[in-house]
Amino acid sequence: MAYNHFSIPKNIEEKENSFFDVTFQDEPDETTSTATGIAKVSIPTPKPSTPLSTLTNGSTIQQSMTNQPEPTSQVPPISAKPPMDDATYATQQLTLRALLSTREAGIIIGKAGKNVAELRSTTNVKAGVTKAVPNVHDRVLTISGPLENVVRAYRFIIDIFAKNSTNPDGTPSDANTPRKLRLLIAHSLMGSIIGRNGLRIKLIQDKCSCRMIASKDMLPQSTERTVEIHGTVDNLHAAIWEIGKCLIDDWERGAGTVFYNPVSRLTQPLPSLASTASPQQVSPPAAPSTTSGEAIPENFVSYGAQVFPATQMPFLQQPKVTQNISIPADMVGCIIGRGGSKISEIRRTSGSKISIAKEPHDETGERMFTITGTHEENEKALFLLYQQLEMEKDRRSH
């Protein structure tokens, strides 16, 4: 069995992997572009404090999925990985996403795609912006490549913003004008940036002379949160480098990230957990389509981790995959339901086997849920678990 271990946040609802092929129109806001690269960091062995990818015999995620051992009640120990110097960090692959306004997206794309084309050729990265959607003001920028190039690309973007903005008094802005950048960070990776007791984020702020604000809540129907960086062009440039290093150090934690898609909340309503729909009716929303109408492959997840897509040929037996996920102690009851009714419904609807640890697995008090099934079955189970958590969170907030 392949083991993926990550903590479930409290308002997750669907998985989006939004990369779009580049198609340029005359109007920037109607332009579509995409980064088809995916960040993948080659690291000898994961660090012991990172429970995200639970591997056996030092195998990679892909290897462990083809050589599947039986699940155990204990998470196998993993060894520490050596530290990297800046030269090594610079070459590590990373995908870094940012949240943009429609106006900012238009500036980055430029007339007939001129700016984004220059961005790619100048910094040697894969870059794309999600397409504009009526009545939706958010768009997502995705940049993939070696860390050094990704940082240069964001510097290029910040410089473009500086050239196309003015100060409150109407004078042109310059490199010393304070500005803001909103990065999208997986909830499971936010701790790598904040650090214990906020120590790491404070260190980054002091080192880069910037101000950083990490959002408490995840964006709708995703497991991504925002980190706002406030400062001058140089401040933002330095902060992005430090944040990139944090993400590379703990890239395994990003597996299973549900990407924020500004379109999803308008076009993909969620079914009710209490409905009597068949498994086909409650399956997670399909991957977004490119402008050519072809579905984006589902085997892309953030920050380098990859999983195998469910086969499209039902007559072939799909491999069973095991995922270990942690549920906050105070939310376990709402998942199980009275007499186990809710967890039984999730098992029946998804087709996955779901077992629950009787005791917390660490000092956080979280309980381990083990989900075993095909990739498609597990996706359905996770979707329903996330939805139940969101419903419970909404109920408690009223």
UniProtKB/Swiss-Prot annotation:
| Record Gene3D superfamilies | K Homology domain, type 1 (3.30.1370.10)
One cellular component term from this protein's GO annotations in UniProt: cytoplasm
Q: Which UniProt keywords apply?
A: Cytoplasm, Phosphoprotein, Repeat, RNA-binding
Q: Where is the composition biased (Polar residues)?
A: 57-76
Q: What is the effect of changing G337D?
A: Barely detectable binding to pmp1 mRNA. Fails to suppress the Cl(-) sensitivity of calcineurin deletion
Which sequence positions carry the modification called Phosphothreonine?
A: T50
Matching PANTHER family: KH DOMAIN CONTAINING RNA BINDING PROTEIN
Q: What name does UniProt use for this protein? A: RNA-binding protein rnc1
